[in-house]
Amino acid sequence: MGILVFDVGTSSMKGALLNDKAEILCQFHRKYHPTFYSSVKVTQDPEIWRKALYDIARDVGDWCKDQNEEVEMISLTAQRTSIIPVDHKGDPLCDAVMWQDKRNIEVCTRLSAMNGQIIRKSGTMVNPVFSGSKMAWLKETQPEIYKKADRIFVVADYLLYHMTGQRKLDRTYASRSHLMNLRTGRWDSVLLDIFGIEKNKLCDLIDPGELHGYTNEKFAASTRLKTGIPVYSAGGDQQCSALGMGIYEEGDMEVTSGTGAFIIGITEKIPICLLYTSPS
């Protein structure tokens, strides 16, 4: 069995074909970079990601043809909070607002007055890196784009849509939006009201590791892979990183350093208070 795994980072995309023993049979990558217009404005053309996805899948397909192998399953993990408003065909209406973009800082400052409710429901306090405040900023500053948007994707559901045609998002990405109730695992009506986001702009939620759909004819024609390959959402890149480093039990912690740096730990219960602390 050949399992094709995509890892969509901020500065490159990697694709690796693994066998059923998790041994790497082949791997390919494409480099790219966001555009930094200023210290607060950071964007990227979403078509760069789609092209990289197709190019890597085509490389894997060519390798499989030469080696008499076959892709039987696809899984994808990606950066988590860059947003992409798309039309009903899944085509971008503007450049992606990257996770490093801080033009939503005024929105966050205003919403921080609601931190009590937001923390209790979403598990995190308002921060410009998360996608919900980026959506609120888009609605306030570019209302025509927001109005035209059939969905507001993050990078993962944008690419998964172009493989399967399904509008779904796994909960590891939604947990970084401030719009999902961390206790119910559902979009929360109170949080949606606070941020001013309509539920129909968001994708249906699934669990990480759940079947997202199957490769469609358009993807197959663009990559020379077959139709009907099951496609799974592996979860957000940092959650997958933690699992890959053996972080399974309460008390386990790991440090990841890439374009961003993270300290990640496991807890069995959601903390009651997640406010930041300092000596002062």
Question: Where do the model's predicted regions map?
Answer:
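Conserved small/polar residues in nucleotide/adenosyl-binding loops
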Residues: Y276-S280
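Gly/Ser/Thr-rich active-site cleft segment
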Residues: G2, V8-T10, I118-G235
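Short clusters of small/polar residues that mark proteolytic maturation junctions
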Residues: H29, V97, T172-Y173, E268
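Carbohydrate-associated surface elements
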Residues: D101
